[in-house]
UniProtKB/Swiss-Prot annotation:
Subunit structure: Homotetramer; which constitutes the Na(+)-activated K(+) channel. Interacts with KCNT2; these heterodimer channels differ from the homomers in their unitary conductance, kinetic behavior, subcellular localization, and response to activation of protein kinase C.
Family annotation (Pfam families): BK_channel_a, Ion_trans_2, Slo-like_RCK
Subcellular location(s) of the protein: Cell membrane
Organism per entry: Gallus gallus
Keywords: Calcium, Cell membrane, Glycoprotein, Ion channel, Ion transport, Membrane, Metal-binding, Potassium, Potassium channel, Potassium transport, Sodium, Transmembrane, Transmembrane helix, Transport, Zinc
Intramembrane segments per UniProt: 280-300
Chain sites annotated for binding Na(+) 2: 753, 756, 771
Topological category with respect to the lipid bilayer: Multi-pass membrane protein
UniProt name for this protein: Potassium channel subfamily T member 1
InterPro entries: K_chnl_BK_asu, K_chnl_dom, K_chnl_Slo-like, RCK_N
């Protein structure tokens, strides 16, 4: 900045001059901090306005200097340039005016042609008109008709005025856009055309005889096209529209076609004035026929000038039009890739949701569309997919199906770009679903991308509801602002953990969160498939109690009373409520909760109440001797979805026989008979209001001394006391606090290692620890923070101390310090480094003492070059363990749900082939649960986290589903809310007979709500080949193994049962295949040194013996040899007990008349014991005087009844 120092003159000062303190030496070198900010004005609204002048005082002893900025823009040329070119609005007006002038000149030319009559004579202006008709008969071409036309004076005056304006405007624009090279401006096509159409008219002003001279004014159509292009560009720039390439190209193509046709029509018509004098319409007809390549030949030019023009026009069309079409096709293909735009008008008049994904796969797309459009009220919604990658072939093929092409719009773009969010009209969307890419190798990076997308959408459209899927639990707190968040690893590990204590919890939850009508498998000849498919249609619904026909009549009654009678009368299962003044959902709040009309009821049923029809029928009242009717509901109306509601039995019992039962008694024990010995067993009534003196069994937080004494008596040694509290160290931010069983003091890290002794203990294998309960082994690649959620549900406070299973983490990589810090407070939690493809690792971690082995999907194998190959290693390893340890319950997580058909694969099993056909049939029928009949899924042995994607989609309609699922999984604990558990039906419990009577028994005795049954049936899987008798007969167990088995069963408390032969004929029929299988299995273990010096005779005998043995014996021998090599006792390896000839499935909310069967496992929602402690002021002794249930705290939590 140049600075000057002038003497201070009072006469020069004025009120508009701003003074500042004198500048120092340092200020002269740089910009003074006192410089005022530059004021910017709108170019559109303040055209030509200049910033005001600023004055700076350089020194107090000198005069002030006024400095004016942007003086270069104050010149006359700059002001004109600003008005004609730079300013968007004014330049748009100028171009619109210019475009109108060009169209007007073309219109005037048409008027001149229509008024022109060559037969009246032609010639110069004010000259005598001469008729050249006779002369022209001797010559073929009348050139005078080409050079001279008849132009009326008013028409000439208007054309001259327009030409003069156009000429002046062109000269002005040439002057303003001059950049040093005048020839570049002169030789432009637009300038040459402008001169041809304007200069001759200006000349006629000064030379009147030339006023009838022909001037090709019709060429102004090309100038109008050029002006229109510029005008559209200015318009898009003014309205900030950037995605206009396709529109511009289509407009250019249409204008080019129109200009070619108009130029050809006018040119041919004028040249034919010297021939047969074609009319303007006939010339237009000829051009259309010619350009459409039809060429009828009824109208043709007769003279060579017009013929030459036709040739020229065709050549121009052959050059120009292909270029235009090529550009249009290219833009069309690009638009097909990018998806175009979702118009603002559609966004304001239609409802749409936006799906943001990093990469769109066909499975994810179909899961979303099937689940989203399964709800009737969402049929009119549109789905806008915003994805940064190009649409793959499979997705493109699906989106071309009419069912989806009318409702799904694919946009290629990024959620981090506001212009792409604008294209998707995110601010008008009903919801935005942001899904993470779970198949990425770096799942943390995938979460980071999801977080940025969520932030970008929240910043752009703060009022749009957000539904976010996150992978890692430690990243969840970054998106807490979202309306609904599903953390994949939290749900996955909690579900896998509950699968170990409540079998097939993963199947139960998956069926609940999938929308189905219960029509799957109804045409199957198998009874279990029809019943399983029918019950799979049950979902969770909600209704306000005051508006409900199901629950309205139970206002003022207890929750337990309402649940039982609603199930008895309508077949619906009431599982929870939400108070109007409280936003928390309570699962089974217990009999203390009194139902109010404002409560929101959550229930399980085939369909919601609003879609149900009620058929009321008057039934005969049952009259039984000695039965009081207080607990019986006389209204027999029910939903038509249940064919028969069985008799609920008696509801009265003698209260004098309800004293406290012994500790080892079952809560479903047969009531003592009174009076006549042939009297039917009775069940206690479900009370309308809770009796505070006889509510529930003793709470779990009381009588710890008794619990400890019982444990001490069993072990005969000192027992480490457990305390109940909240884990002191959470591995990540945002984990829900859960009351758990904890160690009084944290275990040292060295004690957490299972296979290595330390100074605190010398145990090096699971056998040495002498655990009372079976192990739960978890195989994972790394000890991620999500694994913490596997431990917490298994150590929750409501689980009895007797039922706590030791947990062994089999990790590929060593866990980090912070993870060990988080788990060291939990009892009986250990880890070990190893993999499931190493037999030694499996044996050292105690697999033969385990009931459940959980195989977690590895992050490093989630992506594969070939689709669906990510699970190959896991499937093969699990199949190996299935062969080696047939009695083990293996729960496997897969990346792709379609691969579950390979679990426990039997190539020659005709029954599995029949199930495969059933799955294909259900998929063709459009079922969302086509995979449900696969035996591993039905039994809860396989799970894929992608099955829970529908949980997020369902939350759009059912905003409570995520909360209920987290409560069922034990991820969240709400005071007063119950928890999911299971109980097993034994022979002593079969007197109850039906599920409806079981519902009454549980509601009346312990206020538990059953929601389903896990049923296991024996089934013979027929093979396609005859059985090998040798394989079935050559099974022997030596005396030593029997003694070892007996010893381990006495020590581990295992109940012996009937064993089945699990050998299959197809495996034993081919010894070569068995030998290959043996070699493959041996590669899993570390072999010792081979012994030498054995004789050939001994080798031949061993080979003959190996040939005669079955595969089962070979694998058993392999396992025992490795155990001996590792120094492990071979006791406990039961080679006979397996589950290969059984099938299991889940029945959600079965009808009340469903018969109970032996070994059924009933899913229960048990009320929160802490709620009763908080609400009841009675002592533990008064709680133990329960008249309707057992008094021992352990009895209430036993799963074995």
């Amino acid at each position: 900045m140049a600075r000057a120092k002038l003497k201070n003159s009072p006469s020069e000062s004025n009120s508009h001059v701003k003074t500042v303190p004198p500048a120092t030496t340092e200020d002269v070198r740089g910009v003074s901090p006192l410089l005022p900010a530059r004021r910017m004005g709108s170019l559109g609204s303040d055209v030509g306005q200049r910033p005001h002048a600023e004055d700076f005082s350089m020194d107090s002893s000198f005069s002030q200097v006024q400095v004016e900025f942007y003086v270069n823009e104050n010149t006359f040329k700059e002001r004109l340039k600003l008005f004609f070119i730079k300013n968007q609005r004014s330049s748009l007006r100028i171009r619109l005016f210019n475009f109108s002038l060009k169209l007007l000149t073309c219109l005037l030319y048409i008027v001149r042609v229509l008024l022109d009559n060559p037969e009246e004579g032609i010639g110069c202006w004010e000259c005598e008109k001469q008729n050249y008709t006779l002369f022209n008969q001797s010559t073929k071409i009348n050139w005078s008709h080409i050079f001279w036309v008849d132009r009326k004076l008013p028409l000439w005056a208007v054309q001259v005025s327009i030409a003069l304006i156009s000429f002046l405007e062109t000269m002005l624009l040439i002057y303003l856009s001059y950049k040093g090279n005048i020839w570049e401006q002169i030789f432009r096509i637009s300038f040459i055309l402008e001169m041809i159409n304007t200069v001759p008219f200006i000349i006629t002003i000064f030379w009147p005889p030339l006023r009838n001279l022909f001037i090709p004014v019709f060429l102004n159509c090309w100038l109008a096209k050029y002006a229109l292009e510029n005008m559209i560009n200015d318009l898009h720039r003014a309205i900030q529209r950037t995605q206009s390439a396709m529109f511009n190209q289509v407009l250019i193509l249409i204008c080019t076609l129109l200009c070619l046709v108009f130029t050809g029509t006018c040119g041919i018509q004028h040249l034919e004035r010297a021939g047969e004098k074609l009319s303007l319409f006939k010339s237009f007809y000829f051009c259309i026929v010619t350009f459409s390549t039809v060429g009828y030949g009824d109208v043709t030019p007769k003279i060579w000038p017009s013929q030459l023009l036709v040739v020229i026009m065709i050549c121009v069309a052959l050059v120009v039009l292909p270029l235009q079409f090529e550009e249009l096709v290219y833009l069309w293909m690009e638009r097909q890739k990018s998806g175009g735009n979702y118009s603002r008008h559609r966004a304001q008049t239609e409802k749409h949701v936006v799906l943001c994904v990093s990469s769109l796969k066909i499975d994810l797309l179909m899961d979303f569309l099937n689940e989203f459009y399964a709800h009737p009220r969402l049929q009119d919604y549109y789905v806008v997919i915003l994805c940064p990658t190009e649409m793959d072939i499979q997705v493109r093929r699906v989106l071309q199906i009419p069912l989806w092409s009318q409702r799904v719009i694919y946009l290629q773009g990024s959620a981090l770009k506001d212009q792409d969010l604008m294209r998707a009209k995110m601010d008008n969307g009903e919801a935005c679903f942001i899904l993470s890419s779970r198949n990425e190798v770096d799942r943390t990076a995938a979460d980071h991308q999801t977080i940025l997308r969520a932030w970008a959408v929240k910043d752009f459209a703060p009022n749009c509801p957000l539904y976010v899927q996150i992978l890692k639990p430690e990243n969840k707190f970054h998106v807490k602002f979202a309306d609904h968040v599903v953390c994949e690893e939290e749900c996955k590990y909690a579900m896998l953990a509950l699968n170990c204590v409540c079998p097939a919890t993963s199947t139960l939850i998956t069926l609940l969160v999938h929308t189905s009508r219960g029509q799957e498998g109804q045409e199957s000849p198998e009874q279990w498939q029809r019943m399983y498919g029918r019950c799979s249609g049950n979902e969770v619904y909600h209704i306000r109690m005051g508006d409900s026909k199901f629950f309205m009549e139970y206002e003022g009654k207890s929750f337990t009373y309402a649940a039982f009678h609603a199930h008895k009368k309508y077949g619906v299962c009431l599982i929870g409520i939400r108070r109007e003044e409280n936003k928390s959902i309570l699962l089974n709040p217990g009999p203390r909760h009194i139902m109010a009309a404002s409560d929101t009821c959550f229930y399980i049923n085939i369909t919601k109440e609003e879609n149900s029809a009620f058929i009321f029928k008057q039934a005969e009242k049952q009259k039984k001797k000695g039965f009081a009717g207080r607990g019986t509901y006389d209204g027999p109306s029910r939903l038509p979805v249940h064919s028969i509601i069985a008799s609920m039995g008696t509801v009265a019992m003698d209260l004098q026989n309800t004293e406290c039962r012994p500790t080892n008694s079952s809560k479903l024990a047969l009531p003592a008979e009174n009076g006549s010995g042939n009297r039917r067993p009775s069940i206690a009534p479900v009370l309308e209001l809770a009796d505070t003196s006889s509510l529930l069994p003793c709470d779990l937080l009381s009588d710890q001394s008794e619990d400890e004494m019982t444990q001490s008596d069993e072990e005969g040694s000192a027992v480490v006391e457990y305390v109940k509290g909240y884990p002191p160290n959470s591995p990540y931010i945002g984990s829900s606090p859960t009351l758990c069983h904890l160690l009084p003091e944290k275990a040292p890290f060295c004690c957490l290692r299972l296979d290595k002794g330390c100074k605190h203990n010398s145990f090096e294998d699971a056998k040495a620890y002498g655990f009372k309960n079976k192990l739960i082994i978890v195989s994972a690649e790394t000890a991620g923070n999500g694994l913490y959620n596997f431990i917490v549900p298994l150590r929750a406070y409501y689980r009895s101390r007797k039922e706590l299973n030791p947990i062994v983490l089999l990790l590929d990589n060593k866990p980090e310090h912070h993870f060990l810090e988080a788990i060291c407070c939990f009892p009986m939690v250990y880890y070990m480094e190893g993999t499931i493809d190493n037999l030694d690792s499996l044996l050292q971690c105690g697999i033969i003492y385990a009931d459940n082995l959980v195989v977690v999907d590895k992050e490093s194998t989630m992506s594969a070059e070939e689709d669906y190959m990510a699970d190959a290693k896991t499937i093969v390893n699990v199949q190996t363990m299935f062969r080696l340890f047939p009695s083990l319950s293996i729960i496997t997580e897969l990346t792709h749900p379609s691969n579950m058909r390979f679990m426990q694969f039997r190539a020659k099993d005709s029954y599995s082939l029949a199930l495969s056909k059933l799955e294909k049939k259900e998929r063709e029928n459009g079922s969302n649960l086509a995979f449900m009949f696969r035996l591993p899924f039905a039994a809860g042995r396989v799970f894929s986290i992608s099955m829970l994607d529908t949980l997020l989609y369902q939350s759009f309609v059912k905003d409570y589903m995520i909360t209920i699922t987290r409560l069922l999984l034990g991820l969240d604990t709400t005071p007063g809310s119950g928890y999911l558990c299971a109980m097993k039906i034994t022979e002593d419990d079969l007197w109850i007979r039906t599920y409806g009577r079981l519902f009454q028994k549980l509601c009346s005795s312990s206020a538990e709500i059953p929601i389903g049954i896990y049923r296991t049936e024996s089934h013979m899987f027929a093979t396609s080949e005859p059985h090998d008798i040798r394989a079935q007969s050559q099974i022997s167990i030596n005396v030593e193994d029997c003694e070892d088995t007996k010893d381990v069963k006495e020590h581990w408390g295992i109940k012996t049962g009937h064993h089945r032969n699990s050998c299959s004929s197809d495996q034993s029929e081919h010894p070569l295949l068995r030998r290959k299988s043996m070699q493959w299995a041996r590669r899993l273990s570390r072999k010792g040194n081979k012994h030498s010096g054995k004789t050939a005779e001994w080798i031949s005998q061993q080979r003959l013996s190996l040939y005669r043995r079955s595969e089962r014996q070979e694998l058993s021998e392999l396992v025992k040899n490795r155990m001996k090599h590792l120094g492990l006792p071979t006791t406990g390896y039961d080679e006979m007990n397996d589950h290969q000839n059984t099938l299991s499935y889940v029945l959600i909310n079965p009808p009340p008349d469903t018969r109970l069967e032996l070994n059924d496992i009933v899913y229960l929602i048990r009320s929160d014991p802490l709620a009763h402690v908080a609400n009841d002021g009675h002592s533990r002794k008064s709680s133990c005087s329960n008249k309707l249930g057992p008094c021992n705290p352990e009895t209430r939590d036993e799963t074995q009844l």
